[in-house]
């Protein structure tokens, strides 16, 4: 389920909107990575950190307008913390390749980043 870029272009173009990076962590996720990345194309930056997959994960990731990095796996927290030092924006959403960001959530995040200067974080319940 790809988030339609045209549906959220106005939110992305909002002046003074805080920008957001998305971090996606992967290892042998060729079955999931394309759908995951399609669901976050609304973000200002996407960084995928792969743990040297032996399947087509990295090749698929390279077909998207994202940054692909590889790093030996030292645990989930270590991968995500390492990736945090490599993104450009203060706002960061971290997801695994088997997760998706529904369009409604993308709109809500972008709306709040564009309209609520007091917001300082999100809690997103996993379903």
Stretches found by the model and what they are:
Residues 24-42:
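Short, well-formed alpha-helical segments that are part of the catalytic scaffolds
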Residues 76, 100-127:
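Conserved donor NDP-sugar-binding/catalytic core segment of glycosyltransferases
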Residues 92:
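Short aromatic/hydrophobic "clamp" motif used to bind/position activated sugar donors
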Residues 34, 55-64, 104-105:
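Acidic helix N-cap motif at the loop->helix transition within catalytic regions
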Residues 19-21:
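Cell-envelope/extracellular polymer assembly enzymes that use nucleotide-activated donors
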Residues 72-87:
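Glycine-rich, basic loop-to-helix element that forms the pyrophosphate-binding segment
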Residues 39, 50-59:
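A conserved acidic beta->alpha catalytic loop
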Residues 51, 95-97, 104:
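Active-site acidic Asp-centered loop
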């Amino acid at each position: 389920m790809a988030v339609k870029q045209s549906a959220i272009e106005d939110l992305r173009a909002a002046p003074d909107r805080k920008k957001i990076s998305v971090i996606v962590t992967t290892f042998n996720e060729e079955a999931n990575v394309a759908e995951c990345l399609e669901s976050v194309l609304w973000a200002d930056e996407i960084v995928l950190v792969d743990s040297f997959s032996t399947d087509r994960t990295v090749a698929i990731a390279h077909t998207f307008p994202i940054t692909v990095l590889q790093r030996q796996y030292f645990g989930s927290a270590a991968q995500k913390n390492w990736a945090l030092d490599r993104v450009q924006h203060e706002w960061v959403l971290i997801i695994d390749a088997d997760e998706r960001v529904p369009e409604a959530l993308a709109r809500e995040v972008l709306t709040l980043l564009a309209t609520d200067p007091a917001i300082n974080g999100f809690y997103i319940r996993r379903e």
